Amino acid sequence: MAEACRVRRMKLGSQGLEVSAQGLGCMALSARYGAPKPETDAIALLHHAINSGVTFFDTSDMYGPETNELLLGKALKDGVKEKVELATKFGFFIVEGEISEVRGDPEYVRAACEASLKRLDIACIDLYYQHRIDTRVPIEITMRELKKLVEEGKIKYIGLSEASASTIRRAHAVHPITAVQIEWSLWSRDAEEDIIPICRELGIGIVAYSPLGRGFLAAGPKLAENLENDDFRKTLPRFQQENVDHNKILFEKVSAMAEKKGCTPAQLALAWVHHQGDDVCPIPGTTKIENLNQNIRALSVKLTPEEISELDSLAKPESVKGERYMASMSTFKNSNTPPLSSWKAT
């Protein structure tokens, strides 16, 4: 059985950022996975996370949009902010509550940062990610503005999310990248080919989002069957019924292995991510304190090399049917930017 354990600390990247070895993805408290949770319940969960040793919180200006940052601003008042490492993101330009485009131009980078600081009610963001890459703007241009924000004391560390290996390398040459956020789990392993190696070559921390396959590795096909109509996952290829029928086989195999191991499927899947290296920090999200407690206990699940190998063999690319996102969504696979020489500021 997975035991209660203390959440260890880890160095994320090479610039000095220290975080809890498991973070908390905050998106579902406000958006995308059904109706927003009551504010008092959400704040109680955030405070419980801190008291349990999970202090690395992940949000974005597009969660809500904006309401998730406002929630965290309220939850972290009265000195609570000093106990956490707070990451937020920019990049999705929102018009009337809907994503209009991805932007990485200097004017927008600065405006987005200042708006996030105001909503979060803080003077400096610990880790500021470009949420998605603007493929019209050379990454060097975006990074130069982020570097200025570091120099001005508005952000401490810079991160990228869903960026290609070449984009990461070019960005890192302008200013050190502290962390790259990428989907990484037993059912999303395509980052292992190029993204993980470039991060390790450059000393960049790896933040694994959706380490439980957006909940599928915790609840299996019944999750897909019971999604609310306004749940973002209903639109994702992997949650369509024809793909769920295939993907449930992976869940069943993980469940059987977890039963033998004396832990839950979610804990086994999360433990696999934790075992990928000391430079990896998964950020599972949840809206329930009990699930948070269960996720923390995954840190106590020790996997042998043979068990890791068995999980690797279960989670081959052919084990999962359906793309991670709709074709229109920006990911690291379509995130290369024009050469710097092409840029003409307007």
Swiss-Prot record:
Q: Which residues bind NADP(+)?
A: 210-220
Judging by the UniProt lineage, the source's domain of life is Eukaryota
Q: Where is the active site?
A: 63 (proton donor)
This entry's Enzyme Commission designation comes to 1.1.1.-
What range does the record give for the signal peptide? none
Q: What GO molecular function annotation could you give as one example from this UniProt entry?
A: oxidoreductase activity
The name this protein carries in UniProt is Probable aldo-keto reductase 2
Q: Which InterPro entries match?
A: AKR (IPR020471), Aldo-Keto_reductase (IPR050791), NADP_OxRdtase_dom (IPR023210), NADP_OxRdtase_dom_sf (IPR036812)
Task: Give binding positions for substrate.
Answer: 131
> Is-annotated flag, keyword Oxidoreductase?
yes
Keyword Oxidoreductase appears in the UniProt entry: yes
Q: Which SUPFAM superfamilies match?
A: NAD(P)-linked oxidoreductase (SSF51430)
What is the source species?
Answer: Arabidopsis thaliana (Mouse-ear cress)
Q: Which family does it belong to?
A: Belongs to the aldo/keto reductase family. Aldo/keto reductase 13 subfamily.
Pfam families membership: Aldo_ket_red
Q: Which UniProt keywords apply?
A: NADP, Oxidoreductase
